[in-house]
Amino acid sequence: MAQEEGGSLPEVRARVRAAHGIPDLAQKLHFYDRWAPDYDQDVATLLYRAPRLAVDCLTQALPGPPHSALILDVACGTGLVAAELRAPGFLQLHGVDGSPGMLEQAQAPGLYQRLSLCTLGQEPLPSPEGTFDAVLIVGALSDGQVPCNAIPELHVTKPGGLVCLTTRTNSSNLQYKEALEATLDRLEQAGMWEGLVAWPVDRLWTAGSWLPPSWRWYPASLPRMASSPALSTCTESGRRPRLRK
């Protein structure tokens, strides 16, 4: 399935729709495994800019130097967000994804210090509460992807840390977007988060018609929640990441 150039725009759009439309989780992850070798080329065909916009948002909001911040990239896929994070100087990067094939692609450039196999919404994130200075979910908050009820799992963010989320506002995702906004509102009303700003952007796919807003959220004070087993602290920069199950 690998190819040197991405598919045509109609082919790539069809592939994205197919991925979102698979209801069975195992089949969906298998689809992503098979798609992984071509994924970067395909989203380049769509002129996909969500990773860059999310990192721009994070860079402007995060206090302190980027190189000292420990970042978690949830649903990291092939590592498009990591590539954008390295440009402004973020070096301590962890990633999780449910697709082994995607993680294999993400591991190859050596940008992540740790990669873990984890499907958010099906299992806890593999880090203890209050670990990360910032957590991002880019491109996975839509119908058929990460469920809204998984958002409280982001308590792996440190109190005072940042969470940066992107979603879409096209007609096929409006129901999910409304549910996501309701979830974020409930968390804010419960005192778990403080909303900083929502960035409406023209398009995340400049070759398509998906019109998402970008979100930033600030965990003000987090109540105790059931934490997943702790992993060891991050490895030294430049070491090969370890893929964990």
UniProtKB/Swiss-Prot annotation:
Tell me yes or no: is Membrane among this UniProt entry's keywords: no
Gene3D superfamilies in UniProt: Vaccinia Virus protein VP39
Give the UniProt keywords, A-Z: Williams-Beuren syndrome
TM region(s), chain numbering: none
User: Which SUPFAM superfamilies does the record match to this protein?
Assistant: S-adenosyl-L-methionine-dependent methyltransferases
| Clinical note on disease | METTL27 is located in the Williams-Beuren syndrome (WBS) critical region. WBS results from a hemizygous deletion of several genes on chromosome 7q11.23, thought to arise as a consequence of unequal crossing over between highly homologous low-copy repeat sequences flanking the deleted region. Haploinsufficiency of METTL27 may be the cause of certain cardiovascular and musculo-skeletal abnormalities observed in the disease.
Question: What is this protein's name?
Answer: Methyltransferase-like protein 27
Species in which this protein is naturally found: Homo sapiens
Gene encoding this polypeptide? METTL27
